[in-house]
């Protein structure tokens, strides 16, 4: 069974991607920050696709400690990863002044640039492992 992580998969394009891959029999893991919305999205995908292999980890992509913890939890649970889809984004035009994170990064930059880079770096080993057995392309 192929495995995918999708950030921001509880709504929009991420949700539709998760649903389509679940329909194809993939094991889908969502990395999202809102627990209730993510639980509802997972349950809805499971029901609509009859695929029980839809799960999630809570992660705040603007917090690099949270990103690292989510990856550690995933690695403890799974031995392989075929695809990482960095879908989540922070794009709020109503914010007039920068929001600085605990990591001393501007929040949108942390979420949209640093977190995808960190996720890709931390999960590279699993992706390469899948590549060796012909399941992923890194």
Predicted regions located by residue number:
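Conserved hydrophobic beta-strands of the Rossmann-like cofactor-binding core
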Residues: 3-6, 84-85
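Conserved glycine-rich cofactor-binding loop
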Residues: 8-12
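Conserved glycine-rich Rossmann-like NAD(P)H-binding loop of the short-chain dehydrogenase/reductase
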Residues: 24-40
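The beta1-alpha1 cofactor-binding region of Rossmann-like NAD(H)/NADP(H)-dependent oxidoreductases
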Residues: 35, 57-69
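Conserved NAD(P)H cofactor-binding loop of Rossmann-fold oxidoreductase domains
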Residues: 87-93
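Short alpha-helical oligomerization interface
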Residues: 94-110
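Ankyrin-repeat alpha-helix packing hotspot
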Residues: 113-114
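Conserved small/polar residues in nucleotide/adenosyl-binding loops
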Residues: 133-138
């Amino acid at each position: 069974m192929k495995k995918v992580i999708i950030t921001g998969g509880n709504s929009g394009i991420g949700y539709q991607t998760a649903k389509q891959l679940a329909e194809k029999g993939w094991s889908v893991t969502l990395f999202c920050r809102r627990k209730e919305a993510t639980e509802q999205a997972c349950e809805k995908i499971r029901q609509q696709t009859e695929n029980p292999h839809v799960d999630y980890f809570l992660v705040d992509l603007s917090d690099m400690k949270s990103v690292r913890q989510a990856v550690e939890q995933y690695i403890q649970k799974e031995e392989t990863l075929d695809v990482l889809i960095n879908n989540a984004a922070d794009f709020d035009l109503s914010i007039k002044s920068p929001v600085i994170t605990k990591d001393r990064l501007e929040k949108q930059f942390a979420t949209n640039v640093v977190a995808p880079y960190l996720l890709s770096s931390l999960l590279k080993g699993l992706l390469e492992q899948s590549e060796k057995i012909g399941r992923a392309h890194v």
